[in-house]
Amino acid sequence: MPHTLAQKILQAHTDEEVREAGQIVNCHLSGVLANDITGPLAIKSFRAMGAAKVFDKDRVFLVMDHFTPQKDIDSANQVMVTRKFAQEMGVTHYYEGGDCGVEHALLPEQGLVKPGDLVIGADSHTCTYGGPGSRDVAAGMALGRLWFKVPPTIRVEFEGKMPKWLRGKDLILRLIGDIGVDGALYKALEFGGETLSELDVEARLCISNM
């Protein structure tokens, strides 16, 4: 049986043979993302692990996009913890204030991720980067690898011409309405069909991140 796209990506990042959905594989990471909410939690776990340095200062991405600017002392402290960690570890890609943007869009816009990469990011709405927890991100920052459960895949074909004024967000909201918010739990959605050829990268990123 041919591998799905998700399986091919996992296979490219592991020394094990990816055979079937449900299998646990240990993969090397292309990058690790955290923000000003999940970052301090990950940093706390990172230090609790006894880690002395990040696995690659060029492949850890810290984006302060929730509290920009900081609204109070607590949010300022969140950013300060992450900023000091970035300075201590020599993290190359730290974004705050005028250099910042929405984390989900910032990485591809800056050319920090590309097709075929395996990136994890801790955020409740980081489908693009897997959406793991802060402890997983801590392990990723320290080790540069993480375990993954090979997901079953749902193939979605979008056919027909896009009506005027509709965008990628409209497509994915309709799909969610059809399958339900829990319709693809622990599954990978792979998209195809002639409609996608009309969509720009921004619209495709929107579909992937919902």
Residue ranges of each PLM-predicted region?
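Fe-S-dependent hydro-lyases/dehydratases of central metabolism
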Residues: 1-210
